[in-house]
């Protein structure tokens, strides 16, 4: 028996009702003279790598008007939370479906996934993309970055690899790469310090560098005033990733 599911219109209505209830709760808290935490709270669901690589920069550039409730989750789960009204907005990657109604979006930045590995005592790469059966540190197959990397590997059938480690989290893959366990495709914003220090080496093959784009998404229905203010502030930001 197929469980009942909301239609797309039903999901939009559900999201609208959630925002109205949140605003009502905020108004009641203000009337009671209670804590302003609920009144200023921004709920964001973010892809794992963006929660570490992007959110600290955004929070530091925002005026002190908000309190933050951040959940780092898989991309697909973040989209579900947005559709169901459980998040004011999500920080995720390029998704054609989310670039159209009933959603609104802000493009935050562009970056790249570089194939990298640890260096030896002479600063040389421990592994090479042309060696047979190089150990691959990959993202989960159904994750956004996993899909990008697997498509690239399929196009470049000359690459010979053996998957050694799989995770949905960039930071975990980076640590395993730093430990000298294999080659990983990692986002530029997550490895700048390690590249500068020589701990990680970029394996220079331009055709294997993968472009990525990060976006903020929301439903295009009206949110509560605090969330609307956050969205306006976010549009004005110039994102700088260190």
From Swiss-Prot:
Q: Which family is this protein grouped under?
A: Belongs to the LysR transcriptional regulatory family.
Q: Which terms does the record give in the GO molecular function aspect? A: transcription cis-regulatory region binding
Which keywords annotate this record?
A: Transcription, Transcription regulation
Parts of the chain that traverse the membrane: none
Q: Which gene encodes it?
A: qseD
Per the UniProt record, the source organism is: Escherichia coli O157:H7
Top-rank taxon, per record: Bacteria
- Give the protein's function: Represses EHEC virulence expression. Down-regulates expression of LEE (locus of enterocyte effacement) and iraD genes, and alters AE (attaching and effacing) lesion formation. May regulate transcription through interactions with another HTH DNA-binding protein.
InterPro entries membership = LysR_subst-bd
- Protein's UniProt name: HTH domain-truncated transcriptional regulator QseD
Q: Which Gene Ontology biological process is one annotated for this entry?
A: regulation of DNA-templated transcription
């Amino acid at each position: 028996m197929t469980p009942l599911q909301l239609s797309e219109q039903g999901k939009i209505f559900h999201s609208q009702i959630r925002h109205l209830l949140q605003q009502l709760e905020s108004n009641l808290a203000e009337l009671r003279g209670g804590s302003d935490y609920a009144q200023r709270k921004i709920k964001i669901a973010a892809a794992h790598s963006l929660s570490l690589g992007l959110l600290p920069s955004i929070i530091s550039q925002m005026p002190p008007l908000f309190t933050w409730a951040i959940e780092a989750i898989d991309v697909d789960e973040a989209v579900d939370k947005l559709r169901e009204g459980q998040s004011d907005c999500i920080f995720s990657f390029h998704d054609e479906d989310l670039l159209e109604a009933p959603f609104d979006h802000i493009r935050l930045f562009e970056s790249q996934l570089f194939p990298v590995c640890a260096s030896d005592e002479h600063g040389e790469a421990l592994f090479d993309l042309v060696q047979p059966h190089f150990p691959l540190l990959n993202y989960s197959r159904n994750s956004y970055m996993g899909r990008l990397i697997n498509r690239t590997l399929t196009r470049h059938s000359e690459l010979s690899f053996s998957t050694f480690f799989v995770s949905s989290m960039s930071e975990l893959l980076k640590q395993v790469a730093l430990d000298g366990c294999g080659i990983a495709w990692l986002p530029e914003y997550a490895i700048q310090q390690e590249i500068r220090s020589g701990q990680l080496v970029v394996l220079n093959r331009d055709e294997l560098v993968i472009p990525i784009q990060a976006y903020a998404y929301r439903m295009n229905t009206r949110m509560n005033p605090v969330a609307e203010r956050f969205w306006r502030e976010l549009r004005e930001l110039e994102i700088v990733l260190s």
